[in-house]
């Protein structure tokens, strides 16, 4: 009796089983979110339907900036190789969107061929028409960096209404399409001629729903002196604060991202540290790709739910027979009030609603009679996905991340910063003396010995209490001094001999010079008499 009820209940209770996060996202989207999107014509208002390639593609990095800020040179610097279609110069050179991707041989795939390839995540770009597709291509080449990531080069953004109109396609809309699908958006600025044109401001505003993906690079910083660089950095932060209306400060990397000698080498250490941080951020993308796709699907589901409430509310307000056109105009003009009503009734955050002005423009061309009434079952399915399925996928994301190395991207400029004497921080701080035959602490040991013998050593060793009296003079916090003690007490007897005391003072000096302490004592810092214990 009532077997259909028990079957339905059983089906609801049984969790979906997925082999990978990508497969899980693909199935959840197709089975639970896509029906809601199609029912309320989501794709006509916001974003085209997702395809399999959107869930399986490699992480993508989108480069955006005004002309001659070094976008193409930045890619050349990363992959250490010229790519097909590459043009570099002081004038606006890159006039196309170029997807730089891995391929068995060097070559160019034109836009019209690219958007019919089901293996590439670009099929929905055909909606932007031939004017765009003629300015879109894929440069493919065998390169180890491109094994892990793909990079999208964009045309330089110009100033003035004429250039915006003459493109023949909606540049900001294309960038917004890419922004939804990429893992990182890098905005490049030229430190030598800092200027944010009106079109660039509009582009940055179009990316406002993706602040978590945005990083800023202040490029060509070696062309100006330190004092000027501080002023330029301040001006950039002030300008960005006016455009990106968020309380969080956007991360800005300062440097000169090309392989030529630095023109003004005063800030070399700063540039090296910033480059290392940026490279680490890019190298983490493959590891975090599944989490990014999961996050984007959640954002899309929340927007689809709000969209369903908006469309169903408009349908509910429309008359059945007379006065449809006048009512439509009234509803479009009063859309802000409908937003507020939905916000109150369904406890939805204001940040989940689509842009009011853009939505009003899109609604003016729609036939409201084709809109659908509210269908709670579709919304319940999406709520169930967000509450249960996504939580299970989150566990799988962590499992997949734990199996991947922290830095997956290899080759190109990334190899130059990894190991060897030119790796970041090599031979500095605790790494000083790593290649020396003599113990690096030995050169300062006579000075430390003078202090050591004033601390009443017994049988050649001083107690922790006596060592503490001297160590606290450094004014370092007890937590740091405790770590130094642990590293210096190599034989773990709770006492320090003359070599261990010298080592403790060397580590204090390392910390006072602004370097980090190692988690474990490096082999080259182990005192000579203790090396038999190692």
Swiss-Prot record:
Entry-annotated residues carrying Phosphoserine: 456
A Gene Ontology term for the protein's cellular component: early endosome membrane
Residue intervals of the EH domain: 444-532
InterPro entries, A to Z: DUF5600, Dynamin_N, EF-hand-dom_pair, EF_Hand_1_Ca_BS, EF_hand_dom, EH_dom, EHD_N, G_DYNAMIN_dom
Span of domain Dynamin-type G: 55-286
Coiled-coil residue windows: 198-227
Cited function: ATP- and membrane-binding protein that controls membrane reorganization/tubulation upon ATP hydrolysis. Acts in early endocytic membrane fusion and membrane trafficking of recycling endosomes. Recruited to endosomal membranes upon nerve growth factor stimulation, indirectly regulates neurite outgrowth. Plays a role in myoblast fusion. Involved in the unidirectional retrograde dendritic transport of endocytosed BACE1 and in efficient sorting of BACE1 to axons implicating a function in neuronal APP processing.
Protein name: EH domain-containing protein 1
Originating species: Bos taurus (Bovine)
């Amino acid at each position: 009796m009532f077997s259909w009820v028990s079957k339905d209940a059983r089906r609801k209770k049984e969790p979906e089983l997925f082999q990978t996060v990508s497969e899980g996202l693909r199935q959840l989207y197709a089975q639970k979110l896509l029906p809601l999107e199609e029912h309320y014509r989501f794709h006509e208002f916001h974003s085209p339907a997702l395809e399999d390639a959107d869930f399986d593609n490699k992480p993508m990095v989108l480069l955006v900036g005004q002309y001659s800020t070094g976008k193409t040179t930045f890619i050349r610097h990363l992959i250490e190789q010229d790519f097909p279609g590459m043009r570099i110069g002081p004038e606006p050179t890159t006039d196309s969107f170029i997807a730089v991707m891995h391929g068995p041989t060097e070559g160019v795939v034109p836009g019209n061929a690219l958007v019919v390839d089901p293996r590439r995540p670009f099929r929905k770009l055909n909606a932007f028409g031939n004017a765009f597709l003629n300015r879109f291509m894929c440069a493919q080449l065998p390169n180890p960096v491109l094994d892990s990531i793909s990079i999208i080069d964009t045309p330089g953004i110009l100033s003035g209404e004429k250039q915006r109109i003459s493109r023949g396609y909606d540049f900001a809309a294309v960038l917004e399409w890419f922004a939804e699908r990429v893992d990182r958006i890098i905005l490049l600025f030229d430190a030598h001629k800092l200027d944010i044109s009106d079109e660039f401001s509009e582009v940055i505003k179009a990316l406002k729903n993706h602040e978590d993906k945005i990083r800023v690079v202040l490029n060509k910083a070696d062309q100006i002196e330190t004092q000027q660089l501080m002023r330029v950095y301040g001006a950039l932060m002030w300008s960005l604060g006016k455009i990106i209306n968020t309380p969080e400060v956007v991360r800005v990397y300062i440097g000169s991202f090309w392989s030529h000698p630095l023109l003004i080498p005063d800030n070399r250490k700063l540039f090296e540290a910033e480059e290392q941080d940026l490279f680490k951020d890019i190298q983490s993308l493959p590891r975090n790709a599944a989490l990014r796709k999961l996050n984007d699907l959640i954002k899309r589901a929340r927007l689809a739910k709000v969209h369903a409430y908006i469309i169903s509310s408009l349908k509910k307000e429309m008359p059945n027979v007379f006065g449809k056109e006048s009512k439509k105009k009234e509803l479009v003009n009063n859309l802000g009030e409908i937003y507020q009503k939905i916000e109150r009734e369904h406890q939805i955050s204001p940040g989940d609603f689509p842009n009011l002005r853009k939505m009003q423009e899109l609604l003016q061309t729609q036939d409201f009679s084709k809109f659908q009434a509210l269908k709670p079952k579709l919304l319940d399915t999406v709520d169930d996905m967000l509450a249960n399925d996504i939580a299970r996928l989150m566990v799988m994301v962590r499992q997949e991340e734990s199996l991947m190395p922290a830095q997956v991207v290899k080759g190109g400029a990334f190899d130059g910063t990894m190991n060897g004497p030119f790796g970041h921080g090599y031979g500095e701080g605790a790494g000083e003396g790593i290649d020396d035959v003599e113990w690096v602490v030995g050169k300062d040991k006579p000075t430390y010995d003078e202090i050591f013998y004033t601390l009443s050593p017994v049988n050649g060793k001083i107690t922790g209490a006596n060592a503490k009296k001297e160590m606290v003079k450094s004014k370092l916090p007890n937590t740091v001094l405790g770590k130094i003690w642990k590293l210096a007490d190599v034989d773990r007897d709770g006492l320090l001999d003359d070599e261990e005391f010298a080592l403790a003072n060397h580590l204090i000096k390392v910390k006072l010079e602004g370097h980090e302490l190692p988690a474990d004592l490096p082999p080259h810092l182990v005192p000579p008499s203790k090396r038999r214990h190692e």
